[in-house]
Amino acid sequence: MNALREHWQALWTAVGYFTRIPVPASVGFSQAGLNRAARYFPLIGWLVGAVAAAVYWLVLRTVPAQGVAVAVSMGATLLLTGAFHEDGLADCADGFGGGYTPEDRLRIMHDSRIGAFGAIAVCMALLLKWQLLSAMAPHSIGILVAMVAAHAASRAAAVSHLLTHDYVRAEGKAKPVAQRMRWSDALWAGVFGVVPLLWFGPMCAALIVVGLILARWLLGRYFVRRIGGITGDCLGMAQQIFELLILWGLLAWMSS
């Protein structure tokens, strides 16, 4: 019973940390609880993707404009998550684009103000996502599943960096979840991330996973070269990049 309670609290911890959804006061907050919650991060992707799909479907029932429905669904996910991962993308873009040493990059990334590189990166990411999803609109069911799959699998791939990379900044919101991830937690996160992809067939899911493994390896090497490891912002940037790659791959698969 205690083990079940711990998992339940870990799930609620993940919900409270990565969304704006209020969680029961009894959940509390602890470093150990947040680390245990890592395996459930892809399930937050299920939740965010399901909200996006529901909003898209509802808007499309009222306005026959697929681009508008996609835009509103994206806005709903930004409200739900507080643009948590987009903020990480912006911070990384500013730091990597404007810093000349690892120390400079970390200092810029820690600055809450957004710069030109960050603004451009977020705008490009949102535009690409809007265009990719809009292109999926003819696939009425496929686009709904793609929303869930992209949010889930991208979070699984991003959090897997905690399995192999060291955290390089002592302060910051994501520090408590920056301990090395256990293999058992990584396995569960991987399962939660891959399951929605299987709707498109095992071959498609396998190709997406192979692409994510390659992209994760390249991005991890980039982080190490630029700042010597990872930060919470790096995980946000990784999630955004992986989400775009997944949508790109799914669109190519559905269009073939």
Swiss-Prot record:
Its cofactor is Mg(2+). This is Adenosylcobinamide-GDP ribazoletransferase. It catalyses: alpha-ribazole + adenosylcob(III)inamide-GDP = adenosylcob(III)alamin + GMP + H(+); alpha-ribazole 5'-phosphate + adenosylcob(III)inamide-GDP = adenosylcob(III)alamin 5'-phosphate + GMP + H(+). The keyword Transferase applies. GO terms for cellular component: plasma membrane. InterPro entries: CobS. The keyword Nucleus does not apply.
